[in-house]
From Swiss-Prot:
Complex and partners: Homodimer.
Alphabetized UniProt keyword annotations: Acyltransferase, Cytoplasm, Fatty acid biosynthesis, Fatty acid metabolism, Lipid biosynthesis, Lipid metabolism, Multifunctional enzyme, Transferase
Pfam families: ACP_syn_III, ACP_syn_III_C
Domain remarks in the Swiss-Prot or TrEMBL record: The last Arg residue of the ACP-binding site is essential for the weak association between ACP/AcpP and FabH.
Subcellular location: Cytoplasm
Protein task: Catalyzes the condensation reaction of fatty acid synthesis by the addition to an acyl acceptor of two carbons from malonyl-ACP. Catalyzes the first condensation reaction which initiates fatty acid synthesis and may therefore play a role in governing the total rate of fatty acid production. Possesses both acetoacetyl-ACP synthase and acetyl transacylase activities. Its substrate specificity determines the biosynthesis of branched-chain and/or straight-chain of fatty acids.
InterPro entries the UniProt entry points to: ACP_syn_III_C, ACP_syn_III_N, FabH, Thiolase-like
Pathway: Lipid metabolism; fatty acid biosynthesis
Record's catalysed reaction(s): malonyl-[ACP] + acetyl-CoA + H(+) = 3-oxobutanoyl-[ACP] + CO2 + CoA
Identification of the protein by name: Beta-ketoacyl-[acyl-carrier-protein] synthase III
Higher taxonomy: Bacteria, Pseudomonadati, Pseudomonadota, Alphaproteobacteria, Rhodobacterales
S-S pairs: none
């Protein structure tokens, strides 16, 4: 027998404001066709004025709790992945904890940029299998619209705001790859590449700053590293690409998504794709895609799912789980 962290509920929230590609034609030297052809993105959601990352996270958390059929008081811990917390401190996770009316347990943020949700899943899994928590609420939430340079057409058209959440719960499994729950994790980072994707602000500068990215270099690293980490995670679970029902990748760019699937030898009809509707929502993109994939009827109980992501740091990783 082996303890597993099993998905019991999933949910997401998107701000009401939808911004199509055409909206950028008024202020930037760009077109809808240019954005679509290079990224696959057609539209994205932006938070309203005064709407914060913790607001989005709370709405997604409420949806996941409802899907799981449990109350916030039954949660032992909250792990929230974000790079755009409302304040330097306290954590966005503690803000969500308060808004959910959860007075027990503990809550903390994880920051690994676009790889954040994979890192958060790893943390939540460790809490559960080590006996430190029975139920963990795992959230990815971002308001990247707050750190965009609206004069930089190479970045500002790519990102969106949103949140997604999972409820993980301890269950006994047989200790085989047929168990439901998280089967394996692979995490990596290499700080030598920190200048490829970063924000030029923070406490040391006393400014919020804006996102800066060397897109071509990020793309070059992304496909190679994403396929590698996914295959490593599968190998750790005693599985291979042939066993995969769904890849649920970080939704950064359709060309990265396609390139990774091809490198893994998997057809695109085994990939959950939401980038066209949400843009790159950083740490929110994987839980958003998991929630949408379930709602579409793509992801079903018993399916083998691989999530993989790469972000600033560079940081990257993958999680293999049976839904």
């Amino acid at each position: 027998m082996a303890g597993r962290a099993v998905v019991k509920g999933v949910g997401h929230y998107l701000p009401e404001r939808v911004v199509p590609n055409a909206a950028f034609e008024k202020t930037l030297d760009t077109t809808d066709e240019w954005i679509r052809s290079r990224s696959g993105i057609e539209r994205r959601h932006f938070a309203a004025e005064g709407e914060t990352t913790s607001d989005l996270a709370t709405r997604a958390a409420e949806a996941a709790l409802a899907d799981a059929g449990i109350s916030a008081e039954q949660i032992d811990a909250i792990v929230l992945a974000t790079s755009t917390a409302d304040l330097t401190f306290p954590s966005a996770a503690t803000m969500v904890q308060a808004r959910l009316g959860m007075t027990n347990g503990y809550a903390f943020d994880v920051q690994a940029v676009c790889a954040g949700f994979v890192y958060a899943l790893s943390n939540a899994n460790a809490l559960i299998v080590s006996g430190q928590a029975k139920r963990v609420l795992v959230i990815g939430a971002e308001t990247f619209s707050r750190i965009m340079d609206w004069t930089d057409r190479s970045t500002c058209v790519l990102f969106g705001d949103g949140a997604g959440a999972l409820v993980l719960e301890y269950e006994e499994g047989e200790g085989t790859p047929q168990d439901r729950g998280i089967l394996s994790v692979d995490l990596n980072s290499d700080g030598r590449y920190k200048d490829l994707l970063y924000v030029d602000g923070g406490v040391s500068t006393q400014t919020t700053g804006h996102l800066r990215m060397q897109g071509n270099q990020v793309f070059r690293h992304a496909v190679e590293k994403l396929a590698q980490t996914a295959e490593t995670a599968l190998d750790k679970a005693g599985l291979s690409s042939a066993d995969v029902d769904w890849i649920v990748p970080h939704q950064a760019n359709i060309r990265i998504i396609q390139g990774t699937a091809k490198k893994m030898g998997l057809p695109m009809d085994k990939v959950v794709v939401t980038v066209q509707d949400h843009g790159n929502t950083s740490a929110a993109s994987i839980p958003l895609a998991l929630s949408v994939g379930k709602a579409r009827g793509q992801i079903k109980t018993g399916d083998l799912v691989v999530t993989e992501a790469i972000g600033g740091g560079l940081a990257w990783g993958a999680v293999v789980l049976r839904w």
